């Protein structure tokens, strides 16, 4: 059975597959963006600072809202030739936005040293106008001088945990990872994961379907209710005043977004008056009509719905542009009612729908922030993680796949950009031909889009935490393989433990060979150990010790931030309606489910630890190939002069080959560490946390701090990627064996963000039969309880050529962890790690 002859032909699958997304218009717009040099854009940050100076003394929510409004009212706006969907983050074709108040010292260091790089490579170097550079330096110097006590968090940590605690942090010992666990973070007005309301926000379906005027009316009605009840009279409680100003800030922000859209309407009208081409003139008049109406009101058609989604997504970025993970949401569900009605009324063709969606896709990708953080500290270089979620089932078990689900994939395949990322909520009732279409698009895209999530597993996690079925089924992908409810939930700050580092400390009795300091417990001289059980005991003791330290760090950090650093949380209040009557941001408990998923703690490196223990058991205790002392000597020399020992370590049993010996070690290590880390309740909510295993590129940054390991890995090289992927090149028994290893530990999938990467050659997936075999592999993976799976599909020599000749391969896409990226933008060590991943075959 072919895709176009399937049961979905009645859903016009064949016509959708024939849609030409890359029209001459979109080819031109994409080419202009690709050819443009990234330019630093300073207007927004200067307007923010100007407003902040003007509003000194006002409540922080209102100050933040007014600064947001000033940017929308006065920032330059850009409407490029041939655009149909409008709204640009900057005035440049390819601009890098920055909000200096968020990271003034990082910006100042970059500006004064002239170190401008958008991502990680010379190919994507960023330009800044000399006059703008002067203004940027002035802005950064102002904020450095006017920040609250810069090290207030560190002072609190020092007082509670001692000076030695800093040796564990990310920019020293690298036992812990995260922006909030650095000795010298750039602490601006707002900091850390979980800032801006403590929730990941994106334009939600109710806001788009009802319009921002509806949100304004809700906020005004709540204020009227407070006035009627006398809650705003002199002597009102602090909580009442807090609610009042949050509501006022919400109104100011929503009105500013509507006014911003009207600026585009006026610009389009002005351009239409000057336009001589009658076709373009009509398009500009249509753009003006659309922008006059949305996002203030409910869209009247598909074009308006797409434009409303663009304005609201852009507004989220404008409001707090340094916060990543502004998702796009369940786009096939959001837009489908308007698409369906327009098709039925003859107002829209599928071709027109595809071009409008493609125009939207380009606008999402053009959004870029200036990357200032040092290269070695970047977990996800350059990516902004604007995720799209498709399909799934509702509370009644109905398959929600629709025509737009197909069309989104076609847009993604043809336009071929690193972002947005697309995630499909797979379920047992999914149409087989849609699955083949998804894999076909995956093959043609090459860089891991779409990825697949287990729909039932995601829903069951929420049901188990008391979420109503209608909400539990309405979840979406967010960030780096996280997920959250569309109706809103609280997400705390994020901290990760480097498991490979903890195991290294175990090998040296708590001593760190890198910093030459005693960082951990003295759990015993491993050269005297006589069984693997002693290694388990020592490692788990270290784990328990560091888990408690990190929990204390989290409590001190979050408490100190709340007391000292203003966090408006405006975006979450604006987009989650439950926050309005509560008068609280999602961070403060205003979301519908404020404590349903506390996932403040994460880890990386479990598969490395499993391989290490397997090598020790196999080579030291069972076969007596060498002693533990000899192994430590070889690792201390980073294997130089010990090639024989290293080769034996590399050849030892490895996770990912359906080998019960090493898989049982992985299961025990992952289960026990998970119990240790989640056995401590969130100190604020009392909830049992869900362990976060988001991939990004943390295996590179954390690997930099870890010496040689018993699995044969060299010092400073990347750890194993993702949560259940094997050591690169060591999963040699085929894809089924890897999947069997990954799904033997069901507890591993009861986490957030755990990733499973696989790589296949494009040449092997050219036939429908091979795609059907790959689809069967995905089904087996999910049937065995897997959560997430994604594929890099490249021929073996393509990436090698791209590394050698980057200018010729600028648009080659790869899947890193929970995101896709341009291969040439990645650091060499990450490029090498992706190249080294096993190239599996589909039979």
Predicted region positions:
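Conserved catalytic cores of very large enzyme subunits
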Residues: 2-247, 279, 283-286, 290-293, ...
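Extended non-globular scaffold/tether segments
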Residues: 244, 248-260
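Heptad-repeat amphipathic alpha-helical coiled-coil interaction surface used
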Residues: 251, 258, 265, 269-272, ...
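Structural signal for well-ordered, non-membrane alpha-helices
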Residues: 262-265, 269, 365, 674
């Amino acid at each position: 059975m072919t895709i176009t002859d399937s049961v979905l032909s009645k859903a016009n699958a064949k016509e959708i597959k024939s849609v030409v997304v890359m029209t001459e218009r979109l080819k031109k717009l994409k080419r202009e963006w690709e050819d443009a040099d990234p330019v630093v854009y300073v207007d927004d940050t200067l307007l923010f600072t100007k407003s902040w100076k003007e509003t000194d003394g006002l409540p922080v929510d209102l100050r933040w809202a007014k600064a947001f409004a000033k940017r929308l009212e006065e920032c330059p706006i850009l409407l490029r030739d041939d655009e149909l969907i409008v709204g640009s983050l900057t005035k440049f074709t390819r601009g890098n936005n920055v909000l200096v108040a968020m990271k003034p010292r990082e910006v100042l260091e970059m500006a004064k040293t002239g170190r401008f790089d958008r991502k990680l490579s010379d190919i994507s170097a960023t330009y800044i106008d000399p006059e703008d550079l002067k203004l940027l330096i002035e802005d950064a110097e102002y904020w450095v001088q006017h920040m609250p006590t810069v090290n207030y968090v560190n002072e609190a940590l020092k007082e509670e945990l001692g000076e030695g605690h800093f040796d564990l942090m990310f920019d020293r010992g690298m036992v812990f990872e995260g922006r909030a666990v650095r000795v010298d973070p750039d602490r601006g007005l707002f900091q850390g994961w979980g800032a801006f309301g403590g929730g990941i926000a994106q334009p939600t379906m109710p806001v788009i379907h009802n319009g921002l005027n509806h949100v304004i009316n809700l906020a005004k009605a709540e204020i009227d209710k407070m006035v009627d009840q006398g809650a705003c009279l002199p002597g009102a409680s602090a909580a009442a005043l807090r609610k009042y100003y949050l509501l006022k800030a919400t109104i100011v922000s929503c009105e500013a977004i509507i006014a911003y859209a009207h600026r585009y309407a006026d610009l389009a009208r002005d351009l239409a008056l000057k336009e001589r081409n009658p076709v373009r003139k009509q398009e500009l008049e249509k753009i003006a009509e659309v922008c006059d109406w949305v996002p203030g009101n409910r869209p009247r058609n598909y074009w308006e719905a797409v434009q409303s989604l663009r304005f609201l997504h852009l507004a989220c970025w404008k409001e707090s542009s340094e916060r990543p993970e502004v998702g796009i949401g369940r786009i096939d569900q959001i837009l489908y009612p308007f698409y369906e009605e327009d098709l039925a009324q003859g107002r829209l063709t599928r071709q027109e729908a595809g071009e409008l969606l493609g125009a939207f896709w380009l606008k999402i990708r053009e959004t870029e922030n200036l990357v200032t953080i040092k290269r070695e500290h970047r977990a996800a270089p350059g990516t902004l993680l604007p995720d799209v979620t498709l399909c799934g089932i509702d509370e009644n078990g109905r398959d929600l796949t629709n025509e737009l689900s197909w069309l989104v994939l076609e847009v993604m395949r043809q336009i071929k950009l690193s972002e947005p990322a697309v995630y499909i909520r797979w379920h047992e009732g999914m149409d087989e031909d849609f699955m083949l279409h998804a894999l076909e698009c995956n093959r043609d895209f090459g860089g891991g889009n779409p990825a697949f999530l287990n729909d039932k597993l995601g829903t069951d996690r929420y049901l188990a935490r008391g979420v109503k079925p209608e909400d539990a089924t309405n979840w979406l992908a967010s960030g780096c393989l996280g997920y959250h409810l569309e109706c809103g939930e609280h997400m705390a700050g994020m901290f990760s433990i480097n498991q490979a580092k903890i195991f290294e400390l175990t090998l040296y009795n708590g001593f760190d060979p890198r910093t030459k300091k005693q960082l951990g417990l003295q759990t015993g001289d491993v050269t005297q150990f006589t069984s693997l059980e002693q290694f388990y005991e020592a490692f788990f003791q270290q784990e328990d010790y560091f888990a408690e330290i990190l929990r204390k760090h989290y409590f001190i950090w979050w408490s100190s931030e709340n007391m000292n650093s203003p966090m408006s949380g405006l975006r979450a209040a604006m987009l989650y309606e439950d926050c309005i009557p509560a008068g609280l941001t999602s961070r403060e408990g205003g979301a519908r489910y404020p404590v349903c998923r506390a996932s403040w703690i994460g880890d990386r490196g479990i598969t490395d630890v499993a391989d290490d223990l397997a090598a020790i058991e196999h080579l030291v205790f069972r076969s007596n190939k060498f002693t533990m002392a000899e192994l430590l000597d070889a690792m201390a020399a980073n294997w130089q002069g010990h090639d024989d020992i290293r080769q034996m370590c590399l050849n030892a049993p490895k996770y990912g080959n359906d080998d019960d010996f090493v898989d049982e070690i992985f299961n025990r290590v992952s289960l026990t560490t998970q119990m240790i880390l989640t056995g401590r309740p969130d100190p604020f909510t009392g909830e049992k946390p869900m362990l976060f295993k988001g991939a990004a590129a943390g295996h590179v940054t954390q690997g930099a701090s870890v010496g040689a390991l018993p699995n044969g890995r060299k010092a400073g090289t990347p750890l194993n990627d993702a949560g259940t992927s094997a050591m690169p090149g060591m999963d040699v028994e085929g894809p089924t064996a890897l999947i069997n290893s990954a799904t033997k530990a069901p507890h591993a999938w009861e986490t957030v963000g755990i990733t499973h990467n696989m790589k296949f050659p494009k040449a092997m997936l050219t036939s429908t039969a091979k795609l059907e075999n790959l689809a069967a592999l995905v089904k087996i993976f999910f049937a065995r309880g897997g959560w997430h799976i994604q594929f890099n599909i490249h021929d073996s020599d393509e990436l090698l050529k791209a590394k050698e000749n980057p200018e010729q391969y600028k648009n080659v896409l790869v899947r890193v962890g929970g995101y896709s990226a341009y291969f040439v933008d990645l650091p060499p060590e990450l490029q090498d790690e992706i190249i080294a991943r096993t190239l599996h075959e589909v039979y």
